[in-house]
Amino acid sequence: MNCELCEQAAGVILWRDEFCRVVRVASDEFPAFCRVILARHVREMTDLAAPERERLMRVVFACEQALREVVRPHKVNLASLGNQVPHLH
């Protein structure tokens, strides 16, 4: 399998454990752009067991809270996209 999110950090790693990692993506347009990337290759949220989906979303919500406290943005955008790379992020 050839998956760039399996093979590369895909940004500056801010936090990681055995389940997933949080990376800061270099973006001039979105300076606080972060991704939560699953450690193993999974294409869709529904491919995860319910406890895994909940665990992943806890990390997403922790990132949102941290960004709100540190960056104080007008709005936080949460998105689940896989249109470029078929790896859950």
Set out the residue ranges of the language-model regions.
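HIT superfamily nucleotide-processing domains
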Residues: M1-L88
